[in-house]
Amino acid sequence: MTTRLLQLTRPHYRLLSLPLQKPFNIKRQMSAANPSPFGNYLNTITKSLQQNLQTCFHFQAKEIDIIESPSQFYDLLKTKILNSQNRIFIASLYLGKSETELVDCISQALTKNPKLKVSFLLDGLRGTRELPSACSATLLSSLVAKYGSERVDCRLYKTPAYHGWKKVLVPKRFNEGLGLQHMKIYGFDNEVILSGANLSNDYFTNRQDRYYLFKSRNFSNYYFKLHQLISSFSYQIIKPMVDGSINIIWPDSNPTVEPTKNKRLFLREASQLLDGFLKSSKQSLPITAVGQFSTLVYPISQFTPLFPKYNDKSTEKRTILSLLSTITSNAISWTFTAGYFNILPDIKAKLLATPVAEANVITASPFANGFYQSKGVSSNLPGAYLYLSKKFLQDVCRYRQDHAITLREWQRGVVNKPNGWSYHAKGIWLSARDKNDANNWKPFITVIGSSNYTRRAYSLDLESNALIITRDEELRKKMKAELDNLLQYTKPVTLEDFQSDPERHVGTGVKIATSILGKKL
């Protein structure tokens, strides 16, 4: 193990030996002279974050953009790819097997710029499910065959739970239930997009998600280092022996043993490297001209499958719970959304306990669920999430919050029908009343990224998000416009709707299966 840890001199591990910088006083930066409930809350939350999560990046006005639609996201991806000079680094669950246009765009960029290097990180189970037919891995293999693994480094993460009898007996269609690489990071030189969207046609056309573009070299470097670290725990696609085939190996350069050979040792080595990354990054960057930075961004991630069971150093879950615990006044409103609504019980309890006057939960209508009218077992998933929505409403009543908390279903046509959309957005917004309009709530905090805030997100998958806290009025307007864009396709749902609408009836079998398999949803 000592020998492996000494290998940190390799380029993508040098981050672990960066000199620590003097912490920056976040409270001083964000404090306002005005002792309003909003100002007081900002002081409280920034103090809490400073104590518990000091990895922080500072942004000026216009350094964060919010993309509204799938088509805008796709156009931006292609533009950024073609304009990249030094690096492209992408982490996603999968690359759609028909996304030849995107692959051609990357190929064009590599041909145009000989200095450009591309790094891909996908999930190894989802990305190889269709083998030997076309899939994510075969598309990436074509790039490696053309440009070599020195310029195109394609990695496939496979959960360490995928070993032993599970590897042999669990069918391909269901092995994703063991755990996934679920991060969505799209980096181009000194910019990075954080999103919940994957790379396939529906995410580029009619599957609503969220997308934030961050323009910062330091922020981009952080996510590049994270990308490279998780890639070093993953398999690599190298040049195929025969044209049209695929060649996947565990590189000798990886700093850990292959998980299928020694799972316990793999977890020990991977967790030490992750812990080192989180500790080495746990300082604010030195900056000048404090007053010009009106926005703070905290990276938060969940790497539970790579940590020992009782020594999880992940930052997302504890940060979300801490954030919600600071809401002690009805001067703050919140909105929570997840397309797959299986909210972690701890988060649900925190939300229900907040003393809010107004709050919204947005989830997908059964007609906007990507599994609507799918084949096989997955056809029951919309019913499962419907059942979980009903249970949430029952909990709202139990907490006597039905006057304040509204469940809203998002629907835009019917998925898989002409002009029909599906819903995949996820996130949290905290809002304060507009100083010029007391009836108008405007966000000042949001969480953006890959997590659905489910039980599986905090136990089985790799997730990466960012918590944004801002006083920038222009950014707050953009955040409100983003939220309004989601809300315009929603309608409130009550327990009475479940009682009166026969289409909301969920069979006993689905209820039982949901209770048993809830951790996998």
From Swiss-Prot:
GO terms for molecular function: ATP binding; CDP-diacylglycerol-glycerol-3-phosphate 3-phosphatidyltransferase activity. CDD domains: PLDc_PGS1_euk_1, PLDc_PGS1_euk_2. It catalyses: a CDP-1,2-diacyl-sn-glycerol + sn-glycerol 3-phosphate = a 1,2-diacyl-sn-glycero-3-phospho-(1'-sn-glycero-3'-phosphate) + CMP + H(+). Pathway: Phospholipid metabolism; phosphatidylglycerol biosynthesis; phosphatidylglycerol from CDP-diacylglycerol: step 1/2. It comes from the Eukaryota. InterPro entries: PGS1, PLipase_D/transphosphatidylase. GO terms for cellular component: mitochondrion. The active site is at H182, K184, D189. PROSITE patterns: PLD (PS50035). It is found in: Mitochondrion. Residues 177-203, 419-457 form the PLD phosphodiesterase domain. Keywords: ATP-binding, Lipid biosynthesis, Lipid metabolism, Mitochondrion, Nucleotide-binding, Phospholipid biosynthesis, Phospholipid metabolism, Repeat, Transferase. ATP binds at A91, S92, L93, Y94, L95, G96, K97, S98. Its main location: mitochondrion. Induction: Repressed by inositol and choline. Its EC number is 2.7.8.5. Essential for the viability of mitochondrial petite mutant. Catalyzes the committed step to the synthesis of the acidic phospholipids. Belongs to the CDP-alcohol phosphatidyltransferase class-II family. This is CDP-diacylglycerol--glycerol-3-phosphate 3-phosphatidyltransferase. It comes from Saccharomyces cerevisiae (strain ATCC 204508 / S288c). The gene is PGS1.
